[in-house]
């Protein structure tokens, strides 16, 4: 899988405009790039921003974005340190203020007056913070798998795998891991599990696979 810029692809169900882009952001440790996918017509003022959970990436929304692209310009970023976005030089920089700052840079890049926001878990928390600000560009906020309060049980479960860096000798082993840690996603089809897995992996110099 390789990065493709400004690409229109023929996808299932007809032609859907699709592009992979990046926007440059700043942190106390320097500059970094945030990657995002854009679905639908770039001139469509009806914009939906979809932001993923703590250990996931923007490609989780591919199926939804493809479905909504006829009516929305759908933007799906990889939060810094995930997916195809850069990593921060300082590991202590992965904080919600940094994530929110990056997303505000992205929203400015879109050059639109308002957006709808769909946030899963961490993406919902980022959305709540931005939506709470005066003159926020978010006009509608949809929360998935998150709310104003987070249970202790949920935090303990996340703590079981966050920060781990597992390596896999085979794709099958990697998919088993993704299915295990992502069980709360629900009864997905085999094709959906394959999609989540493929866009979660990177090939290491030694030939093994690791999570992005």
Where are these predicted regions, by residue range?
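Alpha/beta-hydrolase fold catalytic core
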Residues: 1-48, 70-72
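Active-site loop/oxyanion-hole signature of alpha/beta-hydrolase fold enzymes
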Residues: 28-30, 37, 63-66, 76-118
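Serine-hydrolase catalytic-loop signature spanning alpha/beta hydrolases and amidase-signature enzymes
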Residues: 53-63, 74
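Alpha/beta-hydrolase active-site loop signature
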Residues: 55, 79-83, 148
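Conserved hydrolase catalytic core segment
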Residues: 113-152
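A catalytic-pocket lid/entrance helix-loop region that shapes and gates access to the active site
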Residues: 138-140, 144-173
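Alpha/beta-hydrolase
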Residues: 176-212
């Amino acid at each position: 899988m390789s990065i493709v810029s400004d690409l229109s692809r023929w996808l299932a169900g007809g032609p859907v405009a699709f592009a992979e882009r990046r926007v440059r952001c700043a942190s106390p440790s320097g500059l970094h790039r945030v990657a995002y996918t854009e679905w639908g017509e770039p001139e469509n003022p009806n914009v939906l921003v979809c932001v993923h959970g703590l250990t996931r990436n923007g490609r989780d929304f591919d199926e939804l974005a493809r479905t909504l692209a006829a009516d929305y310009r759908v933007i799906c970023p990889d939060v810094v340190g995930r997916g195809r976005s850069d990593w921060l030089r300082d590991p202590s920089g992965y904080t919600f203020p940094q994530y929110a700052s990056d997303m505000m840079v992205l929203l400015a890049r879109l050059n639109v007056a308002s957006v709808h926001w769909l946030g899963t878990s961490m993406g919902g928390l980022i959305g709540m913070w931005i939506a709470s600000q005066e003159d926020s560009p978010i006009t509608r906020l949809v929360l998935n798998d998150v709310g104003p309060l987070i249970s202790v049980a949920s935090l303990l479960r996340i703590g079981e795998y966050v920060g781990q860096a597992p390596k896999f000798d085979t794709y099958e082993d990697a998919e088993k891991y993704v299915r295990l840690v992502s069980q709360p996603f629900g009864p997905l089809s085999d094709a959906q599990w394959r999609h989540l897995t493929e866009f979660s992996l990177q090939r290491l110099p030694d030939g093994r696979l690791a999570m992005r």
